[in-house]
């Protein structure tokens, strides 16, 4: 698998066409503060060459993904799906838009970030919720005892990464015990990024910095 990294920019046409795929999507799901579009056929055609360049032609298949438009920062999670640890490859994230708030909040788009952690997970897609009893009604399983349940590469059990404390105040700080940041990427529309599907990752508290919402595309790849 490839280390977390930025990829070559989308063309203006690719960016426009991907936004159109979201806006005209036939499979939409809405939740409070979040909206997902699940029909990826046309989107995969648009970005196929980008993924081929990263992974090699005919070496990968699409295992899942979605368009997402969100007004809230997301939890610590892993995109492992249910393929089994030997099949997962990369997550590809394509930032498409961000909308800024008007008014009193000072806008700071540099605080809109995706943080990729050093820790790995070999189980099914999961949220990592050490220190809280929340039970999200979503596809992902919930992991609370990181050491006992098999999170790989943990720091000391009491460790709190200052980057997570700084960028993610929307979450319970206890979620971050033993976790550490490997890479952090600023959310720039048109600049794709990739990281291994088994890596834990989390978004920053972007609404606190004048960003109303962000739109992106995630594609999860597995070995062919």
Where in the sequence are the language-model features?
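Non-heme Fe(II)/2-oxoglutarate
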Residues: 1-78, 102-110, 130-153
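Catalytic core of non-heme Fe(II) oxygenases with the double-stranded beta-helix
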Residues: 71-199, 204, 208-224
């Amino acid at each position: 698998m490839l280390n977390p990294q930025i990829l070559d920019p989308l063309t203006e046409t690719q960016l426009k066409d991907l936004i159109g795929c979201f806006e005209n999507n036939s499979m939409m799901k809405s939740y409070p503060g979040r909206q997902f579009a699940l029909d990826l056929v046309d989107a995969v055609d648009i970005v196929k060459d980008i993924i081929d360049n990263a992974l090699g032609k005919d070496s990968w298949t699409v295992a899942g993904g979605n368009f997402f438009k969100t007004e809230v920062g997301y939890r610590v999670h892993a995109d492992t799906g249910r393929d089994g640890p030997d099949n997962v490859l990369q997550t590809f994230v394509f930032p498409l838009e961000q909308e800024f708030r008007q008014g009193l909040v000072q806008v700071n788009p540099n605080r809109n970030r995706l943080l990729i952690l050093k820790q790995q997970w070999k189980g099914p897609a999961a949220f990592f919720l050490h220190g809280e009893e929340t039970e999200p009604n979503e596809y992902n399983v919930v992991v609370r005892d990181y050491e006992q349940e098999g999170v790989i590469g943990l720091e000391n059990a009491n460790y709190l990464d200052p980057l997570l404390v700084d960028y993610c105040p929307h979450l319970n700080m206890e979620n971050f015990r033993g976790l550490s940041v490997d890479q952090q990427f600023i959310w720039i529309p048109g600049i794709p990024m990739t990281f291994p599907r088994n890596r834990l990752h989390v978004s920053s508290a972007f609404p606190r910095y004048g960003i109303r919402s962000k739109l992106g595309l995630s594609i999860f790849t597995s070995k062919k």
